[in-house]
Amino acid sequence: MSAWLDEIRWTADGLVPVVAQEAGTGQVLMVAWMNREALALTAAEGYAVYWSRSRGRLWRKGEESGHRQKVLEIRIDCDEDVVLLKVEQAGGIACHTGRHHCFYRVLQDGRWVTVEPVLKPPDSIYGA
């Protein structure tokens, strides 16, 4: 039943990078990590579950904010070492900064420039 998990080339730490892509637009929303349990739960539950390296625990996307990611499709790349999730993003906010996606800065003239607006201030999402 879990043979498909054995096909993934996990890092030495037992993780795999995961790209979350908005299914309707193709926009890359975020990049995170999963361990074997997180990927199995994601497939079973139909909602994104990641591994938080900073907290050292499973993290269900949207568990605090309500901005869950409904997983429509799970793909693996040709090298079997990156996972792609095609998702529907609840609330239109994927980034903890209150933006639609995490890639809101662009390199311009040797410096990072913010080019995407905050849709909802983080303190109103997570509390002060």
UniProtKB/Swiss-Prot annotation:
<keyword id="KW-0479">Metal-binding</keyword>
<feature type="binding site">
    <location>
        <position position="78"/>
    </location>
    <ligand>
        <name>Zn(2+)</name>
    </ligand>
</feature>
<keyword id="KW-0028">Amino-acid biosynthesis</keyword>
<comment type="subunit">
    <text>Homodimer.</text>
</comment>
<dbReference type="GO" id="GO:0000287">
    <property type="term" value="F:magnesium ion binding"/>
</dbReference>
<dbReference type="Pfam" id="PF01502">
    <property type="entry name" value="PRA-CH"/>
</dbReference>
<keyword id="KW-0862">Zinc</keyword>
<feature type="binding site">
    <location>
        <position position="77"/>
    </location>
    <ligand>
        <name>Mg(2+)</name>
    </ligand>
</feature>
<dbReference type="GO" id="GO:0005737">
    <property type="term" value="C:cytoplasm"/>
</dbReference>
<keyword id="KW-0963">Cytoplasm</keyword>
<feature type="binding site">
    <location>
        <position position="81"/>
    </location>
    <ligand>
        <name>Mg(2+)</name>
    </ligand>
</feature>
<feature type="binding site">
    <location>
        <position position="95"/>
    </location>
    <ligand>
        <name>Zn(2+)</name>
    </ligand>
</feature>
<dbReference type="InterPro" id="IPR038019">
    <property type="entry name" value="PRib_AMP_CycHydrolase_sf"/>
</dbReference>
<dbReference type="InterPro" id="IPR002496">
    <property type="entry name" value="PRib_AMP_CycHydrolase_dom"/>
</dbReference>
<dbReference type="InterPro" id="IPR026660">
    <property type="entry name" value="PRA-CH"/>
</dbReference>
<dbReference type="GO" id="GO:0000105">
    <property type="term" value="P:L-histidine biosynthetic process"/>
</dbReference>
<keyword id="KW-0378">Hydrolase</keyword>
<keyword id="KW-0460">Magnesium</keyword>
<comment type="function">
    <text>Catalyzes the hydrolysis of the adenine ring of phosphoribosyl-AMP.</text>
</comment>
<comment type="similarity">
    <text>Belongs to the PRA-CH family.</text>
</comment>
<feature type="binding site">
    <location>
        <position position="102"/>
    </location>
    <ligand>
        <name>Zn(2+)</name>
    </ligand>
</feature>
<protein>
    <recommendedName>
        <fullName>Phosphoribosyl-AMP cyclohydrolase</fullName>
        <ecNumber>3.5.4.19</ecNumber>
    </recommendedName>
</protein>
<dbReference type="GO" id="GO:0008270">
    <property type="term" value="F:zinc ion binding"/>
</dbReference>
<comment type="pathway">
    <text>Amino-acid biosynthesis; L-histidine biosynthesis; L-histidine from 5-phospho-alpha-D-ribose 1-diphosphate: step 3/9.</text>
</comment>
<keyword id="KW-0368">Histidine biosynthesis</keyword>
<dbReference type="GO" id="GO:0004635">
    <property type="term" value="F:phosphoribosyl-AMP cyclohydrolase activity"/>
</dbReference>
<feature type="binding site">
    <location>
        <position position="79"/>
    </location>
    <ligand>
        <name>Mg(2+)</name>
    </ligand>
</feature>
